[in-house]
Curated annotation (Swiss-Prot):
PANTHER family listed in its UniProt record: 3-DEOXY-MANNO-OCTULOSONATE CYTIDYLYLTRANSFERASE (PTHR42866), 3-DEOXY-MANNO-OCTULOSONATE CYTIDYLYLTRANSFERASE, MITOCHONDRIAL (PTHR42866:SF2)
Entry's EC annotation: 2.7.7.38
Family label: Belongs to the KdsB family.
Gene Ontology MF term list: 3-deoxy-manno-octulosonate cytidylyltransferase activity
Source organism of this protein record: Geobacter sp. (strain M21)
Gene name as annotated: kdsB
Keywords tagged on the record: Cytoplasm, Lipopolysaccharide biosynthesis, Nucleotidyltransferase, Transferase
Listed SUPFAM superfamilies: Nucleotide-diphospho-sugar transferases
Record's subcellular location: Cytoplasm
Keyword Isomerase: no
The protein's role, per its UniProt record: Activates KDO (a required 8-carbon sugar) for incorporation into bacterial lipopolysaccharide in Gram-negative bacteria.
Protein known as: 3-deoxy-manno-octulosonate cytidylyltransferase
Coiled-coil blocks: none
Pathway(s) this gene product operates in, as recorded in its UniProt entry: Nucleotide-sugar biosynthesis; CMP-3-deoxy-D-manno-octulosonate biosynthesis; CMP-3-deoxy-D-manno-octulosonate from 3-deoxy-D-manno-octulosonate and CTP: step 1/1; Bacterial outer membrane biogenesis; lipopolysaccharide biosynthesis
Pfam families: CTP_transf_3
Length: 252
């Protein structure tokens, strides 16, 4: 079975333009992501999907494979679907281009559900929430699932709502596991044939309310399998986030 990791990479960004090419210890960020994705045991090949020639040139310079995509795509899923239509992969992994510290093991963890169960169209990851700040923050997407790992809902709101313990919420309750809740890790794995189906679905009510594209899948009755991971990464949305990445690398 052929498994391809695709890294959608845009140059334009409201908070950090050109972040895909941001220098991290002598290499562009997109190269760090590419090299880490290539180390995943289950991944057969890695492709960067971009509509920007500057990013494409940088990828070619370090010997990576790049696919040019339409500049009119509204979402990363649309860009991914375009690439998936051009390749012969059975499974396509969407690796975020702004995750230079992603652990290759995370990618393997997210892929396995699709290898174990051919009826699953899509999978993703979650990790434990360990601070009250993350639990309350609308920038941290929470997720709940059933006992077999099927996602029930994603939300920017606190999820679940601990009605009887709301006034006693403290960091130590999350660290100890007394209050068990999870945040979504934005790594997605798809069966190739499901990507055009997903891309062809119209935006849904809950998706538009929460501004979470993955809710479109649930609202249309498709399953998303979710796996808990112990690994955490740092998404680079701002120059300040890049500083955190550099500090983490210096500590290693």
């Amino acid at each position: 079975m052929k498994i391809t990791a695709v890294i959608p990479a845009r140059y334009a960004s409201t908070r950090f333009e050109g972040k895909a090419l941001a220098d991290i210890m002598g290499r562009p960020m997109v190269q760090h992501v590419y090299e880490r994705a290539a180390k995943a045991t289950l991944v057969s090949e890695v492709i960067v999907a971009t509509d920007d020639e500057r990013i494409a040139a940088a990828v070619r310079a370090f010997g990576g494979r790049v696919e040019m995509t339409s500049p009119t795509h509204e979402t990363g899923t649309d860009r991914l679907a375009e690439v998936a239509a051009k390749i012969d992969a059975d499974i396509v992994v969407n690796v975020q281009g702004d995750e230079p510290l992603i652990d290759p093991a995370m990618i393997d963890e997210a892929i396995r559900p699709l290898l174990d169960d051919p009826s699953i169209p899509m999978a993703t990851l979650k990790c434990r929430i360990k601070t009250l700040h993350d639990f309350l923050s609308p920038n941290v997407v929470k997720v709940v699932s059933d006992p077999t790992g099927n996602v029930l809902y994603f939300s920017r709101s606190p999820l679940p709502f601990f009605r009887d313990k709301w006034n006693d919420l403290k960091d130590d309750a999350f660290v100890s596991g007394k209050l068990l809740c999870y945040k979504h890790v934005g790594l997605y794995v798809y069966r190739r044939e499901f990507l055009p189906v997903f891309a062809g679905l119209k935006p849904t009510y809950l998706e538009l309310a929460e501004k979470l594209e993955q809710l479109r899948v649930l609202e249309n009755g498709y399953r998303i399998k979710i796996v808990e991971t112990e690994f955490e990464s740092i998404g680079v949305d701002t120059p300040a986030d890049l500083d955190k990445v550099l500090e983490r690398l210096k500590d290693r």
